[in-house]
Each structure stands twice: as structure tokens, then as C-alpha cells.
Amino acid sequence: MAKPASIKIRLNSTADTGFFYVTKKNARTKTEKMVLKKYDPVIRKHVEFREGKIK
């Protein structure tokens, strides 16, 4: 069987609240670490979320 093109990643909040999003990305075309600005409901602000591994 072929290896899937998309992998699941965890986007961790840089505000150190412990909040995270789980999303998918194409590992073949997006080789760098993903950084997105999203909403953190714990502090009720938009902050950067950085890619981390799912345990």
C-alpha cells in the first residue's frame, strides 16, 4: 500500500495555554513547519499556532 500524502499535525498555541488544533497537511509539498494565526479561546485572542507532533 502507498503512503498517504497528508499527515495529521497538532498546532500548539504560542501563548502557552495548552490549547491546540489538529489539522492535516501534505507532507510532500509542505516540508517546513506550519505557523498559522488562529483564535485561542482560553485567552480570547488571536495568536500564532506552531506545528508539533501528535503523541
Swiss-Prot record:
**Any one GO cellular component localisation term in the record:** cytosolic large ribosomal subunit
InterPro entries named in the record: Ribosomal_bL33 (IPR001705), Ribosomal_bL33_CS (IPR018264), Ribosomal_bL33_sf (IPR038584), Ribosomal_zn-bd (IPR011332)
Protein keywords: Ribonucleoprotein, Ribosomal protein
Q: Does the keyword Glycoprotein apply?
A: no
| Keyword Ribosomal protein in annotation | yes
User: Which one of the record's GO molecular function terms can you name?
Assistant: structural constituent of ribosome
GO biological process, any: translation
Read off the Pfam families from this record: Ribosomal_L33
Q: Note the HAMAP family from the entry.
A: Ribosomal_bL33
NCBIfam families documented for this protein: PRK00595.1, rpmG_bact
Q: Which family does it belong to?
A: Belongs to the bacterial ribosomal protein bL33 family.
Name listed for the protein in its UniProt record: Large ribosomal subunit protein bL33
